């Protein structure tokens, strides 16, 4: 189950941006929209992403897709002269030239355990990767 998705320095997201599926008590949540898995927090079944035109809604979806593609395709061997998945899917912040690395992180709950997986990368390589 998805708990959080974080993206930084990708597409239109310069700063760290987090989609968080943790229910908060500040809103009047309907119980039917919450998932209680016996942990401290409850989680949302669905989330609506809305905003003005050009506010990043589609880019959040694209960032999730880039994250998935990098993971899936980085295992494939590429032919000589072809771009690898890291180079092909490196799309840093679009509105200014930056040398900063891009970053993804996902937090999931599976089998009652919380897992965090993420990596920081640039056009050449994965700089750091973590899972705990």
What positions do the PLM features span?
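P-loop NTPase switch/coupling surface
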Residues: 1-132
């Amino acid at each position: 189950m998805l708990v959080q998705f974080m993206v930084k320095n990708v597409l239109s997201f310069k700063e760290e941006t987090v989609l968080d599926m943790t229910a908060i008590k500040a809103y009047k949540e309907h119980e039917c929209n919450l998932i209680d898995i016996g942990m401290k927090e409850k989680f949302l079944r669905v989330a609506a992403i809305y905003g003005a035109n050009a506010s990043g809604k589609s880019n959040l979806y694209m960032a999730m897709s880039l994250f998935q593609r990098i993971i899936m395709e980085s295992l494939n061997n590429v032919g000589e002269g072809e771009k690898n998945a890291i180079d092909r899917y490196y799309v840093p912040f679009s509105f200014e030239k930056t040398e900063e690395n891009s970053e993804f992180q996902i937090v999931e709950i599976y089998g009652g355990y919380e897992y965090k997986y993420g990596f920081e990368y640039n056009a050449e390589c994965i700089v750091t990767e973590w899972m705990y």
